[in-house]
């Protein structure tokens, strides 16, 4: 698995609007081959963190333009470019 994590800083009170933005783009996520899942959480009053799980880095790269077009629509809601971290899974624990 390949993971991509984005940390988005925003003005106080924008969290719900940002979450709504991502929810409104679910069709784009569904159309992204190899995307296993994505979730976002409120990390602080002024930060949202998103985690995307892909089958492989190649799958992410094939959909990068589509995903970037979604993120460009987020520009007016965030305070600057997101911090991005990415890499392949090194350790996994599943209780299932």
Please tell me what each predicted stretch does.
Residues 15-17, 47, 59-61, 93:
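Intrinsically disordered, low-complexity acidic/polar segments
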Residues 11-13, 43, 55-57:
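Short coil/turn motifs at secondary-structure junctions
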Residues 9-19:
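Short, surface-exposed ligand-recognition loops at beta-strand->loop->(often short) alpha-helix junctions
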Residues 3-5, 17, 26:
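Generic alpha-helical hydrophobic packing signal
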């Amino acid at each position: 698995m390949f993971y991509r994590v984005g940390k988005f800083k925003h003005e106080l009170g924008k969290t719900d609007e940002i979450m709504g933005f991502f929810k409104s783009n679910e069709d784009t996520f569904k159309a992204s081959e190899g995307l296993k899942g994505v979730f976002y959480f409120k990390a602080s009053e002024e930060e949202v963190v998103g985690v995307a799980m892909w089958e492989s880095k190649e799958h992410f790269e094939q959909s990068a333009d589509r995903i970037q077009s979604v993120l460009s629509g987020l520009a007016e809601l965030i305070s600057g470019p997101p911090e991005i971290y990415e890499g392949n899974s090194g350790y996994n624990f599943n209780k299932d």
